[in-house]
Amino acid sequence: MTVRVGINGLGRIGRGVLRAIFEIEEYSKQIEVVAVNGSLSAKQHAHLIKYDSVHGKFSGDIDFNESQNWLSINGRKFSLYRERSPENIPWNVDVILECTGAFNKREEAIRHNAEKVIVSAPVPDADVTIVYGVNDDMLEKEHKVISAGSCTTNCLAPIVKVLHSSLSIKSGFMTTIHAYTNDQNVLDGNHKDLRRARACGLSMVPTTTGAAKTIGSVIPELKGKLDGTAVRVPVSNVSMVDFTFTTDKKATVEEINEMFKDAALSSTSFQRVTLESNFWIPVSATRMTSEGTKMTSEGTRMTEGYPMSNVLSICEEPLVSIDFVHNPYSAIVDLTGTYVTGDICRVAAWYDNEWAFSLRMLDIALLSHSKV
């Protein structure tokens, strides 16, 4: 069953969502883009979709018509609108992917005329907050405004779920070492956050994040037990979660790492990250052996059955942030960064804060439509 979607906002996440639909067969087979809404001309949007300074050149064919207000990718045409008010957009779709960052309250998101609205940001009064692979079972048919949380919440939540299910977390504190975003200034300028007002490429910028507190909406038994902060750093993409926590049950470094290995090895599209094999295989790049075990196109063995499929992976090599650009996983746990000192434990995980989150938006869109 094809899902008809509209994308509101063609910034970093909106363009990532659009690109993923046409770049990954698993999505292009199931999702039809009916319309997008953005503030630029058709020519400008087409150019920014085609050429991306972080993710590289899009390999597909892109066309546009300025006077008729449409874009076309790989021969599939869709409408381009330039409306500021959601109620003025004639979507005619099943699901809206709200990627502007401007409509982060339920009363605002509900103004879209669609069965489902999935917001790419925390929405305190959303019908539900879904972190794909972690609390999918909380999604109900009647939920209309669905928050996908944030890129950081999507990294932290799978880690917390693995740890909490085995060790029972008592409390925790997260620091996200985060790439700069368009919410910061290239050079010093106006911003309500005086630190984000400063030049993003020249300093580490301490700032805020609600990612840790959002976990309480995703894993209710941890409500009020986690908090966190953020430091924006001078890189254009890929971030890291540094999570320190205490637990009811004691564990060694080796035991904690084994938990993540078991979780990742049970994922339906797991690939161990190595220096020799730093290539991210989308969900569709799989085949079945005669025994029924899935294999990647490179021959990497995978197993079935774990609910965090396609969201959790591990890394045991000494990699750096740029090695994870365009990585599809929500969290790649760096096993070399696990520590235990007395009652305090620490784990770290990488995430492509643009690409992986864009994919999770689409995963939730497919999941929500299956509930209709």
Can you describe what each PLM-predicted range is?
Residues R4, N8, R12-R19, D63, ...:
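Active-site-lining helix/loop region of Rossmann-like oxidoreductase modules
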Residues M288-S290, P318:
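Short linear/disordered segments characteristic of secreted peptide precursors
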Residues V34, S79-Y81, D227, L312-C315:
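General small-molecule cofactor/ligand-binding pocket signal
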Residues T2, G228, M240-L265, E304-V372:
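C-terminal active-site/capping subdomain that shapes the small-molecule cofactor and substrate pocket
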Residues S269-V283, R287, K294, R301-E304:
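A cross-taxon signal for low-complexity, glycine/charged-rich
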Residues S150, N154, L202, Y351, ...:
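Short, conserved micro-motifs enriched in small and acidic residues
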Residues M1-A197, Y339, M361-D363, K371:
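N-terminal Rossmann-like NAD(P) cofactor-binding subdomain of oxidoreductases
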Residues L10, G101, C151, T207, ...:
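Structured loop/turn residues at secondary-structure junctions
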